[in-house]
Amino acid sequence: MTAFPTTPRWIVLSDEAQALEDIYFFLPAMAALRKEGTRVERFETRRWKFSPKLAKARLTGACLLIARSLGREWIEMLENHREQHGRICYLVDHLYSSELLAAEQGTSPPEAGSEPEAAQLQQRLFALADEVVVVSEQLEAALASLHPKVSLLTPPLTGKLPDLHHLEQSDWCIGFHGTLAHREDILTLAPVLRDIQTRHSDSEVELMMGRHLPLALSDIPRLKTMEAVSWGAFQDYCSRRRIAIGLAPLMENSDNRAASWLRFLDITRMGGVGIYSRRAPYVDLIEDGVDGLLVGDDPAEWTAALERLLGDRDATRAMAHNAQHKAHEVGDPLRVLDFWRARSTVARAR
């Protein structure tokens, strides 16, 4: 039997989800855990040529956090030496479809880097993990029957909130700062944004799509488009950029239906009031007309919501203040610290 060290020790096996690791672990919890005596480190698995000997030497006795994905050889090593490690937590922000696995049954191994392979590796990570940590209630419900211990960890507020002096200016910015994964969602609003910008000369639209901007969005009046940036650069941008209105469309057939409400925190950090799709994760978070607006998929509802925020600026300013109060309430980083502090033990959960 492996003799575990008495000093709590976390190792994050980092694959390709640095932003996920930072949001849900490093930024809200690392400094405090280290101050309390817990050893915390990030092992970037793709930067090193895999060596079972090195891996065992580095990982033995540690609590492990795996975010989203991990390479096949690393998973095999953990499977073969599971008794040498402490608690394993698997942090999930995306569930690969079981249909991908079913389609591969009885066929040759899935192609490296393909979605079927990702689905297969995810199932193996579920089997390894003592606890699966999910970022949204949608994922919590979807995984309830797939793992005996599923815990919800909603996103924390990772930066300071601004003053709202920019809302006193005459020119307002309407922002959408989703990644290319949200391309289809914002495309739905192309005619809405063209219409609004045609009728309002005191607003601009900002999209973070750069060279990948779809043609359907390119003729929006007073459009500002910027290239997508790294996770770290985006955090810096959010701390400096000020918007009045943020868009968070999540349409019925969106590929992002398992998303957390991180977009609410991003919009609020930039000083904006959000317009959100009236479905999870926003429908139980936003108080319609108080700290944001909830709308359906009909473009007419998005047009009406934009007109409301642009037309009644005093009410919009009040919503922005309320959104900041809610962000402090639901995004308290101490909640995330307490979550990981309670798990900083080598004792396995099952």
Residue positions per predicted region:
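Nucleotide-sugar-dependent
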Residues: 184, 232-269, 275-284
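A charged, aromatic-enriched C-terminal amphipathic alpha-helix characteristic of glycosyltransferases
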Residues: 20, 297, 311-344
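N-terminal pre-catalytic "stem/leader" segment of glycosyltransferase-like enzymes
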Residues: 1-67
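Conserved acidic donor-binding segment of nucleotide-sugar-dependent glycosyltransferases
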Residues: 286-289, 293-300, 308-314
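Donor nucleotide-sugar binding/catalytic pocket of nucleotide-sugar-dependent glycosyltransferases
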Residues: 127-162
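Active-site proximal beta-strand in glycosyltransferases
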Residues: 82-102
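Membrane-proximal helix-turn-helix segments that form the acceptor-binding/catalytic region
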Residues: 96, 111-131
